[in-house]
């Protein structure tokens, strides 16, 4: 009986070990990228290049679909022709206000605002794509791309994607000359955008687990605290 007990104990430990190993493997791969979109960027009328972003449609399907549809313009409105209205070096670049262009506007495909879907993903690296907001459950169309690790935004802003290609363009945007309220002095514009074919299954590197704006008018992540 003692021998049988030892065998059963070993089997249990082996099963637990296999379960933990499989869980770590899945986590290492990160959230699944289900669609890819692109922005073609100009600065002061001169081409900068293309940014390609992967969206985490399984972890945050509603938020990812909002961004995808605004990139394609299939609802009759979206990001094409809009600008990055706020850039802070070593923090983030922010855009998506295609109605007012100054951080006070924008809208989602679900109406003016929609709720925070979840905070399973964190701001663990450069190139994270996340929703700007004016507080709890105020997501519209404004978004930001991180240019540093911004852990203080975790649990406050919904991460829904990452930059796959063209991070050098993000780097160029974060250092453009700017004026009042961190607005570029010359337009950084999304001149063309849309969806790309998913020719290969891609996995992101996010980690499963971004604060109130400076004013009630401005939808934005917190000011630079790095």
From Swiss-Prot:
Gene3D superfamilies: Cyclophilin-like. Residues 194-226 are annotated as: Disordered. GO terms for cellular component: endoplasmic reticulum lumen; fungal-type vacuole. Glycans are attached at residue 139. The keyword rRNA-binding does not apply. Residues 38-195 form the PPIase cyclophilin-type domain. GO terms for biological process: protein folding. SUPFAM superfamilies: Cyclophilin-like. The lineage of its organism: Eukaryota, Fungi, Dikarya, Ascomycota, Pezizomycotina. Its EC number is 5.2.1.8. Pfam families: Pro_isomerase. Its main location: endoplasmic reticulum. Inhibited by cyclosporin A (CsA). It catalyses: [protein]-peptidylproline (omega=180) = [protein]-peptidylproline (omega=0). It is found in: Endoplasmic reticulum lumen. This is Peptidyl-prolyl cis-trans isomerase B. PANTHER family: PEPTIDYL-PROLYL CIS-TRANS ISOMERASE, PEPTIDYL-PROLYL CIS-TRANS ISOMERASE D-RELATED. Belongs to the cyclophilin-type PPIase family. PPIase B subfamily. The keyword Chaperone does not apply. A motif (Prevents secretion from ER) lies at residues 223-226. Residues 1-28 form the signal peptide. CDD domains: cyclophilin_ABH_like. PPIases accelerate the folding of proteins. It catalyzes the cis-trans isomerization of proline imidic peptide bonds in oligopeptides. Residues 211-226 have a biased composition (Basic and acidic residues). Keywords: Endoplasmic reticulum, Glycoprotein, Isomerase, Rotamase, Signal. It comes from Arthroderma benhamiae (Trichophyton mentagrophytes). InterPro entries: Cyclophilin-like_dom_sf, Cyclophilin-type_PPIase_CS, Cyclophilin-type_PPIase_dom. GO terms for molecular function: cyclosporin A binding; peptidyl-prolyl cis-trans isomerase activity.
């Amino acid at each position: 009986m003692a021998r049988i007990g030892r065998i059963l104990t070993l089997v249990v430990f082996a099963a637990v070990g296999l379960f933990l190993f499989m869980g770590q493997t899945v986590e290492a791969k990160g959230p699944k990228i289900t669609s890819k979109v692109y922005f073609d960027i100009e600065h002061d009328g001169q081409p900068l290049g293309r940014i390609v972003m992967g969206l985490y449609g399984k972890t945050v399907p509603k938020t990812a679909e909002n961004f995808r549809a605004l990139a394609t313009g299939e609802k009759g409105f979206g990001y094409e022709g809009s600008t990055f209205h706020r850039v802070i070096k070593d923090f983030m670049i922010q855009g998506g206000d295609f109605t007012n262009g100054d951080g006070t506007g924008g809208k989602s495909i679900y109406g003016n605002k929609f709720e925070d879907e979840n905070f399973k993903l964190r701001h663990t690296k450069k190139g994270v794509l996340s929703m700007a907001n004016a507080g709890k459950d105020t997501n519209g169309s404004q978004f930001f791309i991180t240019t540093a690790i911004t852990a203080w935004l975790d649990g406050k802003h919904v991460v829904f994607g990452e930059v796959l290609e063209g991070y050098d363009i993000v780097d160029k945007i974060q250092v453009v000359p700017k004026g009042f309220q961190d607005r570029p002095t010359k337009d950084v514009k999304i001149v063309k955008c849309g969806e790309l074919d998913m020719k290969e299954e891609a996995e992101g590197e996010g980690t499963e687990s971004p604060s109130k704006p400076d004013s009630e008018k401005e939808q934005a992540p917190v000011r630079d605290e790095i």
